[in-house]
Regions:
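Conserved core of the sugar-phosphate nucleotidyltransferase
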Residues: 90-162
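Short acidic donor-binding/metal-coordinating loop in glycosyltransferase active sites
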Residues: 87
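A structural signal for short hydrophobic beta-strand segments in well-ordered beta-sheet cores
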Residues: 3, 119-121, 191
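Conserved beta-strand segments of alpha/beta enzyme cores
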Residues: 2, 55-57, 126, 188-190
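Conserved N-terminal catalytic core of the sugar/cofactor nucleotidyltransferase
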Residues: 4-5, 9-84, 294, 300-301
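Short internal beta-strands
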Residues: 29-36, 107, 267, 283
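Left-handed beta-helix
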Residues: 162-306
């Protein structure tokens, strides 16, 4: 999912770009945690870091057991000042957060906090409580998946404790459990409200965020034979479209061919061949070959429908 292209850039590339742009300190090293060895994924991550002249390393979470467990897979990098960002989120914020605390947790007000980890603050923004996906509404400040720690070893020790003692929340090892324990031991965390948040955690939120980014960036519209393009849309280089209606809210990756189709509110990745399709609220991977009429689909890489 983090390597899905949104208006021409992968989610992970956008995250790296935003951190580089908005941080007052130079990012010297990025550690990526992925589920399994994958040459294609690792190559893409390497290219992104090389573009920004950042060193990187890759760690593997072969057996997903929650957010804290994932972070601990890169425990040897948890030293000194550490910024942790979950790769299913984009944001607009600076990183000039207060440095007089042991850590900062980035938050955004949401309508439905039950889908997120949340924090409860005092009047000075100091965090009083961390709760993972609360069943009752104790706060509408959702944790957006960005955390700063002044010393990463504090987090490593806290996660090691919950792993050793098998302290699971909702069946998984959660970072909120580690944070709550750290707070109870006297460490102080501040909440830091971000300006904008684009959530990519589910297909629905991914498409909603895709729509917002297209509207914000307003890409230049290209013209094609017998085709109507309704903005906002992003169409990459090498795309061929004929006899189709595209948009609004569509991204099309490079070298994709589309004929006799109607596509809206949809992400189409690169090197696809699509004929006679009617797509709405859909996500198509790379190298998809499609020649059939479905209305609401999520298709992975190299799929064929004829």
């Amino acid at each position: 999912k983090p390597l899905i292209e949104i208006a021409g850039k992968t989610i992970i590339q956008r995250i790296v770009e935003l951190v580089q742009k908005n941080s007052s300190k130079k990012i010297s090293h990025i550690s990526f945690i992925i589920t399994n060895e994958d040459n294609s994924t690792e190559k893409q991550l390497s290219i992104i870091c090389a573009h920004y002249n950042i060193k990187h390393s890759i760690y593997y979470q072969h057996d997903p057991q929650g957010t804290a467990h994932a972070i601990y897979c890169a425990k040897d990098r948890l030293t000194g000042p550490v910024l942790i960002i979950f790769a299913d989120t984009l944001f607009e914020t600076d990183f000039n957060f207060p440095l007089n605390a042991d850590g900062c947790v980035f938050v955004k007000e949401v309508d439905d906090p039950s889908a997120y980890g949340v924090v409860k603050n005092d009047h000075k923004g100091r965090i009083l409580e961390f709760v993972e996906k609360p069943s009752i509404n104790i706060s509408n400040l959702a944790i957006v998946g960005i955390y700063y720690f002044s010393e990463g070893t504090m987090l490593a020790n806290a996660i090691n404790y919950i792993l050793t003692n098998k302290l699971k929340d909702k069946g998984e090892y959660q970072i909120t459990t580690a944070l709550e324990n750290m707070k109870n031991e006297g460490l102080q965390f501040l909440s830091f409200k971000i300006n904008k948040w684009f959530d990519f955690g589910t297909p629905k939120t991914l498409l909603d965020s895709h729509h917002k980014i297209l509207k914000q960036e307003n890409p230049t519209i290209k013209s094609f034979v017998d085709t109507i393009i309704t903005p906002p849309c992003y169409i990459a280089d090498g795309v061929k479209i004929e006899g189709s209606k595209i948009g609004p809210n569509v991204s099309i990756g490079k070298n994709t061919n589309i004929t006799s189709s109607e596509i809206k509110n949809t992400i189409v990745q690169s090197n696809c061949n699509i004929k006679g399709a009617h797509f709405n609220n859909s996500i198509l991977g790379n190298f998809v070959e499609y020649d059939r009429d479905f209305k609401d689909v999520n298709i992975g890489d190299y799929s064929k429908f004829k």
